[in-house]
């Protein structure tokens, strides 16, 4: 592993209804970036906020000498789509992603850049003494275990978005066309050298988490369907297992009837109902999982943009559009933008 030359660092931050956190976020992130020995830019992507977040970002980008780039999406597309929109606009040799809620402190940015300069393709982080509720921690642990088993990459905390990526990794992710993207997993698929560092984790000071129970369930389906086809194989295994259990149970019912007569359990009516519910439930679970895969395939086949950029405001020269080679054809754009200032 060789040291990686760095000339510019990009910080990409998705923003959704974070107007209370934005002033402190900008102040602390700018202070952390000024400690770096490189040029820097802070790219904030408004993901269809319903509060005043978009206007605050535009004002910050319009200030004289500002290193802030405001990317305004026309509606809410989700955290990972917003980060991909920021990736398209960044020009750094190292790109760092950061949440806007300040639970992961921007002061950790220099440490991530230091590790990336050593030659790592991906620098991940692990939240030390995580300040979330058990409702958030336990599903996160299950997801981390599932991801580790499926990808074979033993990283501890896939849910922490404070990460650093080498430019080549970002370009490789931009070349991917699927709509359902989980960035840490996608990046690890392209990385040769990865590492993890412990970072501080604070309680959320403003607002509330944007991940409700339904969004966490949706995220779990995204993880299952974007990283592996193992659930489809498991359906076959479960189907064979249930069929075998059904035959064994039928044999047991015959033996019980011969041994104890027809009245031993009310003619077996309730047992049959229980078996019916189990099999019906299993069928619906399988149909739902197949529907998830088919729905995502349908979305990918339509090839619509993952997001629509309404406008971009910056005081710096725009980053060149990433060049993507597909079947010998060169494409230089992966989304749609209405206005760039």
UniProtKB/Swiss-Prot annotation:
This is Undecaprenyl-phosphate 4-deoxy-4-formamido-L-arabinose transferase. Its EC number is 2.4.2.53. The chain crosses the membrane at residues 235-255, 269-289. One of its GO terms (cellular component) is plasma membrane. It catalyses: UDP-4-deoxy-4-formamido-beta-L-arabinose + di-trans,octa-cis-undecaprenyl phosphate = 4-deoxy-4-formamido-alpha-L-arabinopyranosyl di-trans,octa-cis-undecaprenyl phosphate + UDP. Catalyzes the transfer of 4-deoxy-4-formamido-L-arabinose from UDP to undecaprenyl phosphate. The modified arabinose is attached to lipid A and is required for resistance to polymyxin and cationic antimicrobial peptides. HAMAP family: ArnC_transfer. Belongs to the glycosyltransferase 2 family. GO terms for molecular function: phosphotransferase activity, for other substituted phosphate groups; undecaprenyl-phosphate 4-deoxy-4-formamido-L-arabinose transferase activity. GO terms for biological process: 4-amino-4-deoxy-alpha-L-arabinopyranosyl undecaprenyl phosphate biosynthetic process; lipid A biosynthetic process; lipopolysaccharide biosynthetic process; response to antibiotic. Pfam families: Glycos_transf_2.
């Amino acid at each position: 592993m060789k040291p990686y030359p760095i000339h510019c660092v990009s910080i990409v931050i998705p923003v959704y209804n974070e107007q209370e956190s934005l002033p402190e976020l900008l102040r602390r992130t700018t202070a952390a970036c000024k400690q770096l020995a490189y040029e820097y830019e802070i790219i904030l992507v408004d993901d269809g906020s319903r509060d005043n977040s978009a206007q605050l970002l535009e004002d910050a980008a319009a200030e004289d000498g500002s290193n802030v780039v405001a990317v305004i999406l026309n509606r809410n597309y989700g955290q990972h789509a917003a980060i991909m929109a920021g990736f398209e606009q960044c020009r750094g040799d190292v790109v760092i992603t950061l949440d806007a809620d300040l639970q992961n402190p921007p002061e950790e940015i220099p440490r991530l850049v230091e590790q990336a300069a050593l030659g790592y393709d991906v620098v991940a982080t692990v939240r030390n003494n995580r300040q979330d509720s058990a409702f958030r921690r336990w599903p996160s642990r299950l997801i981390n275990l599932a991801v580790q088993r499926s990808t074979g990459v033993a990283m501890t905390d896939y849910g922490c978005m404070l990460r650093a990526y080498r430019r080549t990794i970002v370009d490789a992710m931009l070349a991917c066309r699927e709509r359902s993207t989980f960035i840490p997993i996608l990046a690890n698929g392209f990385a040769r050298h990865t590492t993890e560092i412990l970072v501080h984790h604070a309680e959320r000071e403003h607002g509330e988490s944007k991940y409700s129970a339904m969004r966490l369930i949706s995220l779990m389906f995204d993880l299952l369907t974007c990283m592996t086809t193992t659930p489809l194989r498991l359906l076959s295994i479960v189907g064979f297992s249930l069929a075998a259990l059904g035959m064994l149970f039928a044999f047991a019912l015959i033996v019980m009837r011969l041994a104890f007569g027809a009245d031993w359990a009310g003619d077996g009516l309730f047992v049959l109902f229980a078996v019916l519910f189990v099999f019906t439930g299993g069928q619906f679970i399988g149909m739902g999982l197949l529907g998830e895969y088919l729905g995502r395939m349908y979305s990918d086949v339509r090839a619509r943009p993952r997001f629509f950029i309404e406008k971009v405001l910056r005081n710096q020269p725009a980053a060149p559009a990433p060049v993507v080679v597909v079947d010998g054809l060169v494409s230089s754009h992966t989304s749609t933008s209405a206005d760039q200032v």
